A protein has these predicted regions:
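Typically the conserved alpha-helix immediately C-terminal to a functionally engaged Cys/Sec
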Residues: 25-40
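Structural micro-motif
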Residues: 62-72
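Non-catalytic, surface beta->alpha helical segment in thiol-disulfide oxidoreductase systems
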Residues: 72-98
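Short active-site neighborhood of thiol/selenol oxidoreductases, capturing the structured segment around
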Residues: 9-22
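N-terminal leader/targeting and pre-domain segments
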Residues: 1-11
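Thiol-based oxidoreductase modules, predominantly thioredoxin-like and allied folds used
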Residues: 18, 41-56
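Stable alpha-helical elements in mature extracytoplasmic
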Residues: 4, 29-32, 88, 92-95
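Second-shell loop/turn segments in exported
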Residues: 19-24, 79-82
Length: 98
């Protein structure tokens, strides 16, 4: 999972996961994201923001993120959906390939 938020709006859909190591569900969600990435490949940007990372405060403030949030962006970089973990790989694939 990539940490380069500059990829949002690069013409590909993006999903950003707010990973918090203090939440057990974060590891489960990361596993499901990796499963989805194996199926979808490079046609979607799978990105991660670590909760508590001060270098990402602007992003977290702009989108009012919380730990375990999943933010879905279209290819133009517009936020189109937000969910809270846990989403299974199948659900992620469905959301990202429609």
């Amino acid at each position: 999972i990539d940490t380069d938020l500059e990829k949002i709006g690069n013409g590909q859909k993006s999903v950003v996961f707010v990973y918090d190591p203090n939440f057990a569900i974060s590891n489960q969600q990361a596993t499901e994201i990796n499963k989805a990435r194996e199926v979808i490949g490079e046609q979607v940007n799978f990105l991660i923001v670590r909760a508590g990372d001060p270098t990402r405060d602007d992003f977290k403030e702009q989108y009012q993120t919380r730990s375990a949030d999943l933010l879905f962006f279209n290819g133009d970089g517009e936020l189109i959906d937000r969910q809270i973990a846990l989403l299974g790989a199948e659900e992620l694939i469905e959301k990202l390939t429609d």
